[in-house]
Design a protein with these regions (language model features):
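Coil residues (strongly favoring Ser/Thr
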Residues: 56, 61, 84-88, 168
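Start-of-domain marker
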Residues: 41-77
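N-terminal secretory signal peptides that target proteins for export/translocation
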Residues: 1-14
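Acidic/histidine-rich, surface-exposed loop or edge segments in extracytoplasmic proteins
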Residues: 76-93, 245-251
Length: 292
């Protein structure tokens, strides 16, 4: 597996348009205050006089003309139709079906990449719940809603993690009492505190995930083998230890796909809807508390 890091200086078409649009906004605000510098000994203070902007203040025609083409292009992109959903996808912490949907799509995309690039399947996918900011509601889903749900520029990443650290990963998930997940079924017991929680049973999906049906009808039969490595789909925030996933920093190899998670969600939502005219509500239990 190669450690492929994308050129972060290279902007996508959508990113370029956004940056130019924001530049135009900054130009508007640049005329909203005046400053002067006052020096005292070696220290320089900047005094700003703010100018209130009301509806009565006329628009700047040059700024409007500058922004107009980028604004029109962005509005067209944000209104792009993706799919239609029949049931809500909630951002309930740890256990929401929005997280299960996103993790499913991460695994489906990651498996296609891992088979093509490395000749082996991706075993499972996890995400951090903090990457989602709202949910989906019944009705049409547009690109604008995807930006509202996932506003961050995290990308899909594949990590090759030794089994001993995979064990630590599942132990941490037990302490969290769940996380967006796909490709495994796990139970955990509660201790006096969350740090005392322990995962009790774990079964990994025994089949490669090549289709939506593989996701919806998994074969949870494989136990964890700490003597081997696992290929896991995560995001670029988690791979550097974000949200406490520090065990991922022990990955033997890391493959940055260069694909934004929002793009993954858009592509897979569209594919599932075009195939089935329906988005499964993802009500399947994947991580659950084992009563004592």
């Amino acid at each position: 597996m190669t450690d492929h890091r994308p050129n972060i200086g290279k902007l996508t078409k959508r990113g370029s348009i956004q940056m130019l649009f924001l530049t135009g906004i900054l130009l508007i605000f640049s005329g909203c205050f005046t400053t002067k510098s006052v020096s005292q000994n070696a220290t320089t203070f900047t005094v700003a006089n703010n100018t209130a902007v009301y509806d009565s203040v006329p628009d700047d025609s040059l700024t409007i003309a500058l922004i107009k083409p980028y604004k029109a292009t962005m509005e067209a992109q944000m209104s792009e139709y993706i799919a239609t959903i029949d049931s809500p996808f909630s951002n309930a912490f740890f256990v929401g079906n929005l997280g299960r949907l996103a993790a499913d799509y991460m695994l489906l995309s990651a498996n296609a990449i891992s088979i093509k690039e490395f000749g082996v399947p991706c075993h499972f996918a996890i995400s951090n719940n903090g990457g989602f900011r709202t949910g989906f509601y019944p009705g049409p889903v547009t690109m604008q809603q995807l930006f509202e749900v996932m506003p961050f520029e995290n990308e899909l990443v594949l990590v090759q993690l030794p089994g001993i650290f995979v064990d630590s990963l599942f132990q941490y998930i037990a302490q969290l009492q769940g996380t967006p997940a796909s490709g495994f079924l796990m139970s955990y017991s509660k201790g006096n505190t969350r740090k005392d929680n322990r995962y009790q049973s774990l079964k990994l999906n025994a089949q490669p995930v090549n289709s939506i049906q593989d996701l919806l009808n998994p074969q949870y039969t494989q136990p964890l083998d700490t003597r081997r490595d696992y290929l896991i789909a995560v995001n670029s925030y988690m791979v550097v230890g974000g949200d406490g996933f520090t065990m991922l920093k022990h990955a033997k190899k890391i493959h940055y796909t260069g694909i934004n998670l929002r793009t993954v969600l858009a592509q897979q939502l569209k594919a599932e809807y075009e195939a089935n005219k329906f988005i499964d509500p993802r009500k399947q239990i994947r991580i659950y508390h084992e009563p004592q």
